[in-house]
């Protein structure tokens, strides 16, 4: 059998209704796109300082407060640039002297690098774990920020979010929820900053960061700003806090992103909120993991079920199967973005089961994979 992508034609009855399974940018629902088309003239191309766009930001902030059942004093803060920019925002505006990190994949490591290389901070304490496993930082003398990912998108590992034992009373727990927010369970009271971008479970485009901040974290941001530390204007967390209270961002946002995000949050809340969303992602991901466990050629990359993500499933293949060829053949049939994270370097498929992904589409995807595997092993 040829390895050419077009050499396998998957029967139409096996194909999912929507073939997008990427881990970010991820699936945007048709209903969101229709809402964008319907409302676009009212908001696209209008001032972000005026009521139509400010109402969008207000919908987002109110919707997230409902979704995460925010305690009194917690605030939803927005800024431009995505989670990558927020790492620098946090280095400048949240870490007083020293950060402690757990890293077990590409994205946790990038935030650790941001604080560890900041010339105005002490060397970070970094706990390393092998890709495919998870970790949470332990109490470290002098650390005033403890940071780790809720979900490591590169490896498909999820962690429990709980304030580490023995840390200082005023230490901040800062969680990268970029691919976890809205698809994994969380008690926000265990966090001081729960930050994410909207291009995954939140069903929108990238280029925006959102941070749910505790009163303790807000106080820290003001403390650092008042200390006289030089902070670039575009990375000033206090500026973002104060603009968000006015339902706006410091500089011009991508308004379409805001609209798609508002629609997604309200869709999740309207269906039952975080409890509904997390049950949906759990059931979808379990389909993938059970399939791998019953396969003769595939295994779950994350071996400990307790570490397996409900929103990003990583599946290894043995040497008899070239996963890249499988992904190419799926793509040629309209089933896209199941390639592994590029730097992980494994013979693997990575399948997103974000809340926008219909469980029936996951079942169809697995049938398509079986069809391709049968074809390439004849």
Regions found by a protein language model. Give the residues of each.
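Active-site phosphate-binding strand-loop segment of PLP-dependent enzymes
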Residues: 129-182, 193, 201
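Conserved PLP-anchoring active-site segment centered on the Schiff-base-forming lysine
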Residues: 93-109
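Conserved active-site segment immediately N-terminal to the catalytic lysine
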Residues: 188-199, 209
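N-terminal "arm"/small-domain region of PLP-dependent enzymes with the aminotransferase-like
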Residues: 1-47
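Active-site C-terminal subdomain of aminotransferase-like
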Residues: 27, 199-282, 286-289
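Conserved PLP-binding catalytic core of the aspartate aminotransferase-like
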Residues: 299-329
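PLP-dependent enzyme catalytic core of the Aspartate aminotransferase-like
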Residues: 2, 18, 343, 347-378
